[in-house]
Amino acid sequence: MKLAVREAVASDIPALQSLIRASVLGLQAADYTPEQLEQALERVFGVDTQLIADGTYFVAEAHVDDGPVIAACGGWSKRKTLYGSDHCAGREDALLDPRHDAAKIRAFFVHPVWARRGIGSKILEVCEAAAVQAGFRRFEMGATLTGVPLYLARGYVEREHRQVPLSSGLSLPIVHMEKHL
């Protein structure tokens, strides 16, 4: 399998939306209820176009017989927002100061067909390297329960468990994780 990681562009958004839905429903069902997943897809998970505009969101394209297919996506941010798509409440688009703040690792999703092949780790390496190039020496994220094992294996530590409010009294458990260089 030939794999290439590149910056996401606006024309990728429809494919990213499909990928995110497939990833959430196909890989996170063991950690969350169907109701949590559907509400999270409406309120939390999805494309953050600010990451694409900032040039800090990446896609991994697998080159198959029919041409390139987006197998995974993920990014980092120099902004205060820790998680969430364009329609997530509580967004903070203010810029971070790399001398004092941690870069945010954001919105990692792998299509179930391409899961557990090291693609998420590859995108994470690209994101961390880009954040370091921008002057950051610390990283943090709001990880899904499904993603925690990957991030632990990549040197992140759990800081606290949090609940992201959804609707109808539901919430989405996530784990605040950090990594220092």
Residue ranges and their predicted role:
Residues 21-47:
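Conserved GNAT-fold acetyl-CoA-binding loop/helix
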Residues 61-65:
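Core beta-strand residues in small-molecule sensory/regulatory alpha/beta domains
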Residues 56-60:
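Hydrophobic beta-strand residues of extracellular immunoglobulin-like
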Residues 124, 131-144:
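Conserved GNAT acetyl-CoA-binding A-motif
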Residues 54, 68-115, 125, 130, ...:
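Conserved acyl-donor/pantetheine-binding loop and adjacent beta-alpha core of acyl/acetyltransferases
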Residues 117, 121, 133, 145-161, ...:
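Conserved active-site alpha-helix within GNAT-family acetyltransferase domains
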Residues 1-14:
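Conserved N-terminal entry element of GNAT/NAT acetyltransferase domains
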